[in-house]
Amino acid sequence: MANGTDASVPLTSYEYYLDYIDLIPVDEKKLKANKHSIVIALWLSLATFVVLLFLILLYMSWSGSPQMRHSPQPQPICSWTHSFNLPLCLRRASLQTTEEPGRRAGTDQWLTQQSPSASAPGPLALP
C-alpha cells in the first residue's frame, strides 16, 4: 500500500498487464506498408548490423597492441595500416618475387640438406 499507516484510504493506482488489454485488431490489407516489405527491412537492418560488426572487428584487429606496433620485428610485405591500399601492396609483393627468383630455391636446398623429412615425398608403393 502507498500509505501503510492509514488503512481506510483506498489504493487508487492500477497495474495494466498486456493480457488484460484487448489489442486493436489490424487488417493486413489496410496497412500502408506491405507485410513483406517490413520483413525485408528487418533482414536488411540485420545484415547491415552484421557488416558493421565485421568492420569494427576488422579495424580492431588491424590496430593491434602498442607493444606489437613498436617491436623490432621485420616489416611484413603488406603493412595493413588504417588505410586500405591494395594495389600498392600487390605491386610490392610482385616486385619482391620477381627480383629474387634464385633466393627461394636456395632456401629449399638448405631445407633438404638440413632434414631429410623436408624433401618431397616419393611415389607410394602399392602392395
From Swiss-Prot:
**InterPro entries per record:** MRAP (IPR028111)
Question: Which residues are modified to Phosphoserine?
Answer: S94
- The record lists the membrane-crossing segments as 38-58
What does UniProt give as GO cellular component? endoplasmic reticulum membrane; plasma membrane
Q: Which domain of life is it from?
A: Eukaryota
- Protein family per UniProt: Belongs to the MRAP family.
How it assembles, according to the record, is: Homodimer and heterodimer. Forms antiparallel homodimers and heterodimers with MRAP2. Interacts with MC1R, MC2R, MC3R, MC4R and MC5R.
Q: What does this protein do?
A: Modulator of melanocortin receptors (MC1R, MC2R, MC3R, MC4R and MC5R). Acts by increasing ligand-sensitivity of melanocortin receptors and enhancing generation of cAMP by the receptors. Required both for MC2R trafficking to the cell surface of adrenal cells and for signaling in response to corticotropin (ACTH). May be involved in the intracellular trafficking pathways in adipocyte cells.
Q: What is this protein called?
A: Melanocortin-2 receptor accessory protein
- The scientific name of the source species is Mus musculus (Mouse)
Lineage of producing organism: Eukaryota, Metazoa, Chordata, Craniata, Vertebrata
